[in-house]
A protein has these predicted regions:
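Non-transmembrane, aqueous-exposed alpha-helical and coiled segments at domain scale
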Residues: 1-149
Length: 149
């Protein structure tokens, strides 16, 4: 049995919230930049060029690629031989989202109750999908879901 302190989950989720809003995977960035050079439609070329400029600006200024940083959707694979210590696992994820969105200066746009429309001001709660898998590892993937998607 492997023990994992939930503070490590909080730290990892915080960092992933910030990074996933600022940096695209290298293969996706490369594909977009290649498309900029080969696109023949003027509108398509303009959109792709905007995306490339946004990626460059995000990297240089440490800001989000897009102003819509969305709602954090967290996919977790937890090994059946993992035992969390130091607190509640789901609360650790929500705290990581809270810290990542606030400290990363990401747009806070989640409401606590859809009828009251009151902003939580920290982008919680996150949507959490958890799978139990064999082993003693924990894998986290944070996917910000923009509200236009």
């Amino acid at each position: 049995m492997r023990e994992v302190n939930v503070s490590k989950i909080t730290d990892a989720v915080k960092q992933l919230c910030i990074e996933t809003n600022r940096i695209l995977p290298a293969d996706l960035e490369e594909t977009i930049c290649k498309a900029c050079k080969t696109e023949t439609n003027d509108t398509g070329k303009a959109i792709l060029n905007d995306l490339c400029r946004n990626m460059d600006a995000a990297r240089e200024m440490q800001i989000p690629i897009c102003q819509d940083t969305g709602m954090a959707v967290v996919f977790v694979e937890v090994g059946q031989d993992v035992h969390f210590i130091g607190g509640d696992f789901e609360q650790a994820i929500h705290e990581g989202v809270r810290q990542g969105y606030v400290e990363g200066l990401l747009r806070l746009s989640v409401v606590g109750d859809p009828l009251e429309r009151k902003n939580t001001n920290d982008n919680t709660p996150a949507v959490i999908h958890t799978r139990i898998v064999p082993g003693d590892k924990v894998e986290l993937l944070v996917a910000p879901k923009g509200f236009g998607s």
